[in-house]
Amino acid sequence: MQNRPIIIGVTGGSGGGKTSVSRAILSNFPNEKIAMIEHDSYYKDQSHLTFEERIKTNYDHPFAFDTDLMIEQIKELLAGRPVDIPTYDYTEHTRSSKTYRQEPKDVFIVEGILVLEDQRLRDLMDIKIFVDTDDDVRIIRRIKRDMEERGRSLDSVIEQYLGVVKPMYHQFIEPTKRYADVIIPEGASNKVAIDLITTKIEKILKEARN
């Protein structure tokens, strides 16, 4: 492994294709030591709250995340030390008791709606990417995901989107576009953008190994 891992930040609105872009980049490096760290894993523990209180949490606000812990763990990985990353239980709306061990890698993709919002996190990144997707596409994807994967009802997803997700996108997420080195329209289907980013990562890796 090289002396310092490459950190790539990937952000954009909920349902905008961040994960697809991240996986597309990952798939271009099958023989490299590369891994993805999701900001969603760092949603704060809410076990002290009732279930009714938990479901009212604004999950699209910076305060919902334990970004301090994420920064601390990324710094540990940068120093070549493994960390135990938390996991989040979306059905119980709180942090799970389970963690997973993340070993040091050459490249880390840090993915989430607010990973460019905190300057301390941005300062750790070598490449910052904003996935720019139409609002209509994002809401359709979010409905499909939350109903199929998180057991949500259609009404609850739409209510949350209109009352929280959409306003938080315009208040906190969209403004971080100005920090991005690369803005990708059309998400993972934009093969040119994915290839350009892949080439840049390959160049950084090559330079680090020489």
From Swiss-Prot:
GO terms for biological process: CTP salvage; UMP salvage. It catalyses: uridine + ATP = UMP + ADP + H(+); cytidine + ATP = CMP + ADP + H(+). Keywords: ATP-binding, Cytoplasm, Kinase, Nucleotide-binding, Transferase. InterPro entries: P-loop_NTPase (IPR027417), PRK/URK (IPR006083), Uridine_kinase (IPR026008), Uridine_kinase-like (IPR000764). One of its GO terms (molecular function) is cytidine kinase activity. ATP binds at G12, G13, S14, G15, G16, G17, K18, T19. Its EC number is 2.7.1.48. GO terms for cellular component: cytoplasm. Pfam families: PRK. Pathway: Pyrimidine metabolism; CTP biosynthesis via salvage pathway; CTP from cytidine: step 1/3; Pyrimidine metabolism; UMP biosynthesis via salvage pathway; UMP from uridine: step 1/1. It is an enzyme of class 2 (transferase). The keyword Oxidoreductase does not apply. It is found in: Cytoplasm. Belongs to the uridine kinase family. This is Uridine kinase. It comes from Streptococcus gordonii (strain Challis / ATCC 35105 / BCRC 15272 / CH1 / DL1 / V288). The gene is udk.
